[in-house]
């Protein structure tokens, strides 16, 4: 029977001899179960397959078989006998059993009334004998059952076999279904009964010969021993079908009584709000094994008022019926936009786009708003005939300097007219013009113009002279091919601007500083049907000069924007491994203010919010009963179509694109919309062959083909260029990207941000659960509400973070495109800010470095170095290229120059006041202080440039001064404002601060167009010098102690308890430092009452603050908060607890005792399973797609991501996502915790919490790797404890942490050699001298000779040194394990010498391996390949390879001092002379007698040891190092 069960669900057979045989077997089995009869053999059940189940053929035979069947079956149709329309046509194809075809029968002898693809001839006689008498079924229900193959009404909508019926028969079927629905309305209780009835059929049952069962099953609904038939009360019609009766009979007979107990054994015990998962199973031996999760699961009911869905429903309640027309309605009323009195058009620009290739090259498209009465409508401005602007840098012979000076003087003296002067310049440049003309003609450029102009250049190209000079300006159309960027000629040395884009040229020439009002003086309109865009209006401008910035005396307000949030719900196609869309929710905010924040009350105002959802049923499922009525009711209630149903993904996409076009959105919002939703949307449109006239409505440009969607998208760079071109005209606001820029969070998922920022609890739905939600209207409504809620949350997050006004301010300051700012393009913002500034000063702008030029320069760099130089990237100081195209090299480049100065901290716990002083905006202030600019400092290829001698301010200092002065004025206004105006001003000052602080970064960013390494190096050099001079001033002149300094700040230990005296010192220091500088200002950033200083960039302190004149205290952490590291919440909580004890705990003894008690308490709670499971969750961010990790098997979060993606969870496990995991071991297999790697034992929290899970939290791992490193690091400077003691409190083996304790207490081994009080203390960390007996191979440790002799003379008990060794060995030179009378145990002097030499060689070899270990307790990275990155003051090769995740320093695991100490210990063991000199005369005589016998035996070994030690350079001092 078991064998039949294993195969019967996968196939169906017609009646015949096999069916009869199975029936006989079933009856015999029934008799056996009832009468206790056993077969004669007594061996249990005899189960065998008489015939093979499958035929094995190759592809050619299979194709021939299908063709033959199709030919034989041609014209074969089985009619249903009643209507003749429900027959089946056999096409000769094999059935694909991998596809679901409705609920499958588990009875092979009968298909239970199901239509499974082949119509079987049934014999009435057999049916009557096998099946009991049933009531007469309603004809309509019977017809429906024939269609769907199910005796249950709801399966008509979920059975895939229903899809196979011909399209021409739909009308008849719909009539039948309407009749059924009119007669029968099933309720939810019917579904539950039917579900309970079918549950036993889903339980895995394994039959063993000893009748013992081993299984784990869910406890849901397992109390009934017999299935309850489902009955529809309305018509008194029994819906029991043949399948369920026979199936239930068989299973109730086969399953023993103890099995039903087993089915309910997976129980949940609740204690208060916490749940403990307990799984109880029976083993094959009948012994119960109980597995209990060793952590609690929080089961507190969340406040329904804080539910995100509740918040969305509240917001949706504000949408009145009068607003229904807003969604999906076209513009009414006026059809013409407003014009000014002079006929010009006012146009507010939001976005711009240009086609880089094709026929439209050189044409740009501006998208924005025009005023139409009291409203604003979308408009597209097509700008044509934009000209290239290329500058040719002439050789010195073209414009001789002496002639130019004479001509300019004649013009100045009015002896030469300006026209004549220009004519002279043209004559000088004739040769240059002819050469350029020839180059243009070769490119088929027929229309161009050239003119000599005077321009400045001040950037980094060595082939372009710096300063003011005459160059040749070349203008020709963008439709023509560009001149090569590396083109040179006889009369010119370089070309600049040849590849500048038309859009950049237009923005700079027209001085457009971000979104603003433009004035279009001359234009032509076109109808929407003839236009190139989907905007409401479209105008064409033939010359860019017709567009100017609007200068209006009256204040012009910004138009509101239409903001649309999109959320997709997808399922995973497992065969193709792609995401498919099943629902799309759209939320539209019709009047969003873009320049000022919008508080919550204003956002909730009725009439500005609308929503829409379109859903389609997944393949193989249908819509639940009454779904159409539910949709109709929802639409009627809202007064418009807010819910639409479709039958295919293609139809869903078409409807979505149509609705988006009707909304005419300006901004698209979503969480990770640029990384997931937008990509999936367009990929599916492409796969479903959606017409370009439809999918292009996602943007505002009409398109005939889809751009390449995949492109070079770096981590955190937003959407790919292909995706951005598809939505051209609409801005993209990704709240995922924005939150990463504006917030510091552990996780940036929508769920976590909703909780931390909006105080809303979001419900997540797994992609694998979505198809199940189509089984009932209730769950399907839940799915739709979840999609709408997610869209609402992303929009609320955008408003909460004030993303639109902040990015608008940044864009208006910088003058770039708003869409780029929203995508996080910080470098481009600063780039455009400088482009606008230098362009207005008549400077030739630096070109972008193209990929081709990068490869050329990279090849040149590689050729400049010798082949054997493997450290090119580290030695190369000119890091022109950040992304080296040579993929083969994984070597990371070090910094091109030294960074900020970081002083070595004076570690310890300070209980007196500590001052933190820092310079305000150090690097921007240095630029102003020393007049550092492209235009003021001459640069050379080698060396750091000197400070400028010119007092004329450069362009960069002026920019900095301008930004700083504006910010100061804004901050002054903030003091007078409150409420919304204060909020608005605060956003503006933030934007100014971000721009000023980013200015220095562009100088040191190698991919920036304004990259200037000499300037960046000079700025950081001055910063280091300023910090050092400040430290010297404080220490030498003010006699204060500086305990730490970092880049722009210093910490001063006051040594005082009086806060007033500390304030006086603060004022004195600030005054003395600030009077030395003009622009640099130092200020107090904090007063700390108590501070724990651990190491560089790692400290914690109690910060004293004054609010309303009253002091208050708060703990401030830096580098010890463990927010962005792979630490669990438990580690963070224990770290915070230890910090609070240290910083508030009083005396050192009290602090240590409190920490020890807390550690023992938490250990007990963890061992007893009293810690919440959520506290064990570790989070780590994926920096790239999981499949792209080369070392994925050693990365826990990558392994979890890969496993979850295999199960269909695509969202949340991609690059930039934070993956949660718990380190576990399998229940009943505790040995796996030590044998399997960490990555193999990492599990997602949902995997651990799932019912039936066999995973337990690995408590030992969390104690040893999550808690001990954190606590030991925090307590490193606390007297009275040690890593060993902390480990003991946590129940760990203290011996494993002994070396760490020794390292902490004796960082310099020479200290213990010189100042130790005894030999035992001096050599306590050394390895013992171990000798091996040649006879019995026993190894034993040898004490020192002197201690062994003294012990034998005095007859005292063995010292600690000799406890683990034989104290009489040196007197007998005999193996302590061998018999004394046996001569085989004697160890000769040669043996001693050889074994000592071998051990010494091992220590020397260990030293020369050069193993490095990271000093950070939480990292402990071990390597033999040092990282040659330069970082601050650190020595080359000491930076941890895990930087920046780890800021630790690599240290030698076995240092030269360790080797010297070990060799000294061996010398001490074998010493027979020096130790005698320290003894009293009386004792010395006795010892000397014993030594005379031992000395010859160890002489050779002692000589070898001394010789090795003397060769160690550590024991020698070079006189050259101490002689002046």
From Swiss-Prot:
Keywords per UniProt: DNA replication, DNA-binding, DNA-directed DNA polymerase, Metal-binding, Nucleotidyltransferase, Nucleus, Transferase, Zinc, Zinc-finger
Any one Gene Ontology cellular component term annotated for this protein: nucleus
Catalytic reactions of this protein: DNA(n) + a 2'-deoxyribonucleoside 5'-triphosphate = DNA(n+1) + diphosphate
Cellular localisation: Nucleus
One GO-annotated biological process of the protein: leaf morphogenesis
UniProt-listed CDD domains: DNA_polB_alpha_exo (cd05776), POLBc_alpha (cd05532)
DNA-binding recorded as keyword: yes
Chief location of this protein within or outside the cell: nucleus
Motif CysB motif: positions: 1414-1446
Bias (Acidic residues) ranges: 79-96
SUPFAM superfamilies: DNA/RNA polymerases, Ribonuclease H-like
Residue intervals of every CysA-type zinc finger in the record: 1333-1378
GO molecular function, one term: zinc ion binding
Classification via InterPro entries: DNA-dir_DNA_pol_B (IPR006172), DNA-dir_DNA_pol_B_CS (IPR017964), DNA-dir_DNA_pol_B_exonuc (IPR006133), DNA-dir_DNA_pol_B_multi_dom (IPR006134), DNA/RNA_pol_sf (IPR043502), DNA_pol_a_cat_su_N (IPR024647), DNA_pol_B_thumb (IPR042087), DNA_pol_palm_dom_sf (IPR023211)
Basic and acidic residues biased stretches: 20-30
Record-listed Zn(2+) 1 binding positions: 1333, 1336, 1375, 1378
Entry keyword Signal: no
Binding site for Zn(2+) 2: 1414, 1419, 1440, 1446
Signal peptide residues on this chain, from the entry's feature table: none
EC number: 2.7.7.7
Region annotation (Disordered) ranges: 1-53, 68-139
Family as reported in the entry's similarity comment: Belongs to the DNA polymerase type-B family.
Misc. remarks from the entry: In eukaryotes there are five DNA polymerases: alpha, beta, gamma, delta, and epsilon which are responsible for different reactions of DNA synthesis.
Function of the molecule: Polymerase alpha in a complex with DNA primase is a replicative polymerase.
Name of the protein: DNA polymerase alpha catalytic subunit
Organism: Arabidopsis thaliana (Mouse-ear cress)
Taxonomic classification: Eukaryota, Viridiplantae, Streptophyta, Embryophyta, Tracheophyta
